[in-house]
Structure formats: structure tokens, C-alpha cells
Amino acid sequence: LPCFLEKTHRFPALELVVGLLLLITSADLGINGRAIFRNIDYATPYMRMDEYVSYLDDNKPLIDDIKASDSGMYRICQNYQLTSNDPMLLGFKGMFHYSSTYTQSINALTSKLGIGQAWLWNTGYGTTPVTDSLLGVKYLLSDTAESSGYYSLKTTDNSVSVYENPSAMEFIYSAPLASADISFTSDPFENQSRYLNNLCGS
């Protein structure tokens, strides 16, 4: 570098060109860096540390209680969220998942069953007792009252309740071979009915 600077110093025009290139490159890196951070903030907004800690303090004990009382294989779903990957944040198997390595067939199925899905992101929004049971959702964390056949287990000071779904199925269950071929419609409730009927072989 000192040798290069010494050579450019002998040629003022070259020194000017190098300086301009350095300035342009620095500006380009700065503008692109700012754009990247703004787009990341748009996709997954930044939050204050106290918001993050408060969310963990409110929700992690609920998850820990569930896992301590039930060591089985099941999903936990929420009707609220902090991030696009709350199950990874809180350490449980859930419905919310954001990944660039998504499986297209899974995303297509959840969308046809009426579950909120947006390209790389699967959610638990829009589930019903039927889809919860089929997908092994045994527990629900809800900040609103649930009355669709779920048992209330616990309500916290911050009005989040834990509900249990007594009809939750296992992650893996057998079904007739014909159930692999289902003709879906544009009606998610009809699709849920067809999916369930095919699983039952009817």
C-alpha cells in the first residue's frame, strides 16, 4: 500500500481517480448497507431490548410448564407472535416457521386448509379444531378466550391462557393409500372435510 500511494503521488491525475473511486465505493457500501438494514427492519422489525425480555418473561414459563408436565411429541400453537420464528425463540415445536428453505408442498397444503401462509412463512393463524388435531397441535397459547372444545389449563397475569386440545393426533398416523390423492377446492372448510374423509378412507 505505501508503495502504491507513492506511485500515485507522482501522478496527480491517477491520485485523483483513485480518490474518486474510493469515495464512490465508500458511498456505495454505505447506501447499500443502510438499504439492507431498512429492508430487514421492514421484513422482521427491530425491537427494544425491554420488549424482547418482557415477551420472554411472559411466555417462556408457560412453555416450560407445558414441557415439564408433558414429555410427548406434540405441537404448541399461538394466536399471537413476536417474531416469525417464535417456536425457535421459545424452544418448542410449533406452527410458525419462516425459512428460505421451505418445502413447497407443505406450504401449498397449509394454504389450502385455510392456515395463514405467505411464501416463505407458515403460521398458525386460521387453524380450526380439525386442523389443530390433524397437525398434532395439543396446546394453544391464546390472548383471547377460546371455547371450541379446548380445556383451559392456566391463565397468567398478562391475560395469556394455555389451552389443551384433547383431540390432538400424533405427528405420524396411518391412512389408506388413496388419501395421497385429494382434489382440493377454493373453500378451505371443504378442503378440511375432504382431507379428513380421505384419511378415514371414505
Feature locations, PLM:
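Beta-sheet entry/capping signal
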Residues: 15-24, 73-76, 138-139, 160-162
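Flexible loop/turn segments at secondary-structure boundaries
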Residues: 31-34, 41, 82-88, 96, ...
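Membrane-proximal extracellular/periplasmic loop immediately following the first transmembrane helix
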Residues: 56-64
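Short periplasmic/luminal acceptor-recognition loop of GT-C membrane glycosyltransferases, typified by
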Residues: 63-102, 163
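Flexible, solvent-exposed extracytoplasmic
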Residues: 67, 97, 130-202
